[in-house]
Structure formats: C-alpha cells, structure tokens
C-alpha cells in the first residue's frame, strides 16, 4: 500500500490511457498533456494550502490501493479527498465503486470530455453514485474546479 506523510493532502487520481493525453484523440481531450494537468492541479492547490499527490495508472488494483490509503488519511484528518478521472473504468468497474464506498473517501469524479455527448456506453458511471460530485466536459479546467470544490466542501 502506498504511504503518504505530509499534511493537508489531496489525491489526483487518473485511470487508464490518461498517460496519453495530448496525443490521444485531441479532438476529444484537447492538446494538454498529463504533465499540464499536474501543473494545473499544483497551481490550483498550493494557494489553498493543499499538497497534491498525483497518480496515473492503467491498472485497476493500483488505483484501488491509492483509494484505500487516502480513505485512511481522510479518516485521520490528514486529507480532504480525491479528484478522480477513472477513464474507461468509469463504465466498467464495480471494484472502484466498492473501494470508494467502502473507504468513505470523498471523491469528485472528473472527466475532460462530456461523456454524455459521446457513445451511449459512456453515459453510465459506476462511480457517480458514490462520488460527492461529478464534473464533465470542461476540459482540464475540471480538475481545478474539483480541487476548489473539495477545498471548500463542508463534510456531512
């Protein structure tokens, strides 16, 4: 399981194929790279007093490990939650749903493209029912908005 040691944290979690940002279907996802997304996230989080932990993985189990670790940090009051772009796992992963639900990790599901303006199979999300919010179709700016939302969120 990953270890995290600093205070106050926010996890930026990216799923499969997001390592290809900037070159994969730019008409759908734009020309920004994953490094650009990371820079935007850090630039947004730093003035809010947040430390970003940025992760991209093409492997479901690795994403689950980070969700588990951050769920524990949130319970300890050391993290606010996660901005999570699950990529194609959005539409297929009961395991990610169960990890978020089981840990209580506050997640804002984030998509660069408007998944509802795309193929019908992309219209269903297994994550949305356990997310505290969903942002879609606003490009990489959605990550910044999600960070701001977590920073200003009042826990239930």
Residue ranges and their predicted role:
Residues 6-11:
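Extreme N-terminal starter segment of soluble prokaryotic enzymes
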Residues 27-46:
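Short catalytic helix/loop segments, enriched in acidic residues and glycine
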Residues 51-61:
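Short beta->alpha junction loops
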Residues 70-82:
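Short acidic/histidine-rich motifs immediately flanking catalytic phosphotransfer sites
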Residues 91-105:
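Short Gly/Thr/Asp-enriched flexible loops that form oxyanion-binding sites at enzyme active sites
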Residues 101-118:
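Short, acidic/small-residue loops that bind anionic groups at enzyme active sites
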Residues 136-156:
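A charged, well-structured terminal subsegment
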